Amino acid sequence: MEDFQLELVTVKDIKDVTRIEYAAYGIKTKYPSATSYKNRNYLRFYYNTNRNNYYKIMIDHQVVGTVLLCVNKHSTTLYHIALDTLYRSLGYGSKILQDLLAKSNKLRVTVPYGHVDLLHWYQRKGFTIDSIIISKYASYWKDENIINPGKAWVLTYKEKSL
């Protein structure tokens, strides 16, 4: 496996953050949670930050994903990963997570609607699911009795005992 590197990108405009975010997930249309104020938790998370540091995940000069380090007005550090599905399945995500978890044991993840495989991937990597940010159209997960649509989940990493 090639080494990955993180290239710091300082985001000056909130529109740049959301544009990168859409591109990272291949979302071509406007994110549904931005359509009304009460359902804008996802975008409001960025608006409340006082520093947005975006890291591009590079492998052999190719961007394969992004990492967003957010420090909000309450000085809570949260990490956001958007990693291409192909590279995630190849295991690059695991190495990236290990590096980030050296700084924090909590990871905030946005799961696009329908990408339940992303949630399962984090579970397999040793995260316990407390909360996650998802689209308001997440009602199909109600059967699993895991979430309330619109609530934020936080994934908390716990070392696996040997």
What annotation goes with each model-predicted range?
Residues 56, 62-70, 77-82:
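Conserved beta-strand in the GNAT
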Residues 94, 114-141:
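Conserved active-site alpha-helix within GNAT-family acetyltransferase domains
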Residues 103-114:
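Conserved GNAT acetyl-CoA-binding A-motif
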Residues 113-116, 135-162:
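C-terminal "cap" of GNAT-fold acetyltransferases
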